[in-house]
């Protein structure tokens, strides 16, 4: 099993490999020293903190909310007329297939940036466009969930996306995005130090 420690684990930028003991020596030999340099103690400490938080009940609630938010966003996008690869999502990610529209992934990414929504262009299976243009956009829900967004908020995000890629008025959509972010500030109640126990 391979994974990153950033993204859904919300830790430092790194990765890890889990394997059975019988494969450990081969994995270690393949990774170090050729692919991995010396250990960075601050990154090791950050990983330890990330794994400690991931073992908590609160983190499980966070992960469940990520999934619920992903379903809400996927539903809103599809209800707004956008096509999703695989017809929805079964994790925290989804990819909008723009081939039936006039949008390229790049143009959609730029348009959504105008209404303060960050996505990234992505190729879709059998994409005829080059990767820098692409025919899709990829979205995920961990960051907004960490910020406190719930299913209702993600339905609004879906409406903002479909509006921006449709006939929506950009100034009005931008104002709605601002209102949503004001409702869910980045660091509500932050006192200048973390509280992990």
What are these regions (language model features)?
Residues 72, 76-80, 107-115, 164:
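Generic non-transmembrane alpha-helical segments
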Residues 1, 5-11, 110-118, 144-159:
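Short, basic, helix/turn surface patches
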Residues 2-103:
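Active-site C-terminal subdomain of aminotransferase-like
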Residues 9-10, 28, 36, 55, ...:
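Generic, ordered loop/turn and secondary-structure boundary motif
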Residues 68, 131-197:
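PLP-dependent enzyme catalytic core of the Aspartate aminotransferase-like
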Residues 25, 75, 110-113, 159, ...:
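Solvent-exposed alpha-helical segments within well-ordered globular domains of core cellular machineries
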Residues 36, 40, 60, 79, ...:
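Intrinsically disordered or highly flexible coil/loop and linker segments, enriched in small
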Residues 83-148, 194-197:
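Conserved PLP-binding catalytic core of the aspartate aminotransferase-like
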């Amino acid at each position: 099993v391979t994974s990153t420690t950033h993204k859904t684990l919300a830790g430092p930028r790194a990765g890890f490999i889990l394997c059975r003991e019988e494969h450990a020596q081969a994995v270690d030999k393949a990774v170090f020293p050729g692919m991995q340099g010396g250990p960075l103690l601050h990154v090791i400490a950050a990983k330890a903190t990330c794994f400690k938080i991931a073992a908590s009940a609160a983190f499980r609630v966070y992960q469940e909310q990520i999934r619920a938010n992903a379903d809400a966003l996927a539903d809103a996008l599809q209800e707004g007329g956008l096509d999703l690869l695989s017809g929805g999502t079964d994790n925290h990610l989804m990819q909008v297939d723009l081939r039936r529209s006039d949008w390229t992934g790049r143009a959609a990414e730029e348009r959504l940036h105008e209404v303060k929504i960050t996505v990234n262009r992505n190729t879709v299976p059998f994409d005829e466009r080059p990767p820098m243009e692409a025919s899709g956009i990829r979205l995920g829900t961990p960051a907004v969930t960490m910020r406190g967004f719930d299913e209702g908020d993600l339905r609004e995000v879906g409406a903002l996306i479909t509006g921006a890629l449709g006939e929506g008025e950009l100034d009005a959509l931008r104002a709605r995005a601002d209102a949503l972010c004001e409702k869910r500030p980045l660091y509500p109640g932050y006192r200048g130090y973390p509280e992990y126990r």
